[in-house]
Amino acid sequence: MEGLGEEIADFVEYASPDADELRARFATMRRLDSVAKALWPGSEAEPFGSTKHRMLLHGSDLDVRIRTVGKFENIPECHGINQLGAEVMKQPWAVDMDPKVTGRVPQISYVDSISKLRCKVCVGNRQTVRGTSFFNSPMIPLSMRFPAFKVLMLPVKTVFKQRGLEKSFAGGVGTFRVGMMLLNYLAMHAPASTRPPTPDVLGGALIGFFRYYASAPADGSEWQKWTEPFAF
């Protein structure tokens, strides 16, 4: 277990964005922010989800919400995203535009040609706020009880991504669902899961997580104890 835990720690360091990428992400968001402010004075581009909480992989998409204020505070989301999309298309740094205005949360997706990052952008303060608040409110405070949570999120997300299962709109599981699965597993294995993220803790928890969701039989150890197989 300790050897696997050391590999997990090395992988997290390798897979996390470095300082240059973090600066590129910030610059990408500032370019979008300037476009939004020209449309809706006082508005602000802000990251959400895994981007905000630093649970992102190197080169992963940049998730941004345009928070509108004042007389634009309650702008209809479809109208807002159409307006923003039209302006973003005029920018020389925006390529490969892909609008999705008919979904539950209308958004535009484009590649920033300077940073090479794909940006996914939504507008407004109603449905989008509820979605990001749902991510922030129950998951992040609860995860603080489990020091290994953020460390394990990256390798777990990578496994789902390698198998093409990271897109929630395509039937997969996005960051929020992966986080809830991991929290559910860690909550079932307290107090072991409340210990510092040492190599043996990381290795045991990662193996136990996949055995649990694979309906593997439990062996009764501190990382593999459940009363019945998990069933989808």
What are these regions (language model features)?
Residues 1-232:
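Non-catalytic helical "accessory" subdomain of NTase-fold nucleotidyltransferases
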